[in-house]
Amino acid sequence: MVEGARIDQAHHENWAQRALNETVHLNQAVERAIAMVNLSETLIIVTADHSHNMVFSGYATRGSNPTGI
């Protein structure tokens, strides 16, 4: 089992870059799991118990890095 709880923790703290990084890490873990099993004999399920939205407010200029806030 792989859990991505740090994605949720980052969203609670409004840490956009950390939430994105943790999502990438979860994706990499799922890719590794897929590589380790026989997919004709194994079911891999990725799910969530809730979600968060990510809002970038303010008056950023074009080309600004939203994760550098």
Question: Residues of each region from the PLM?
Answer:
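A post-motif C-terminal structural segment
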Residues: M1-I69
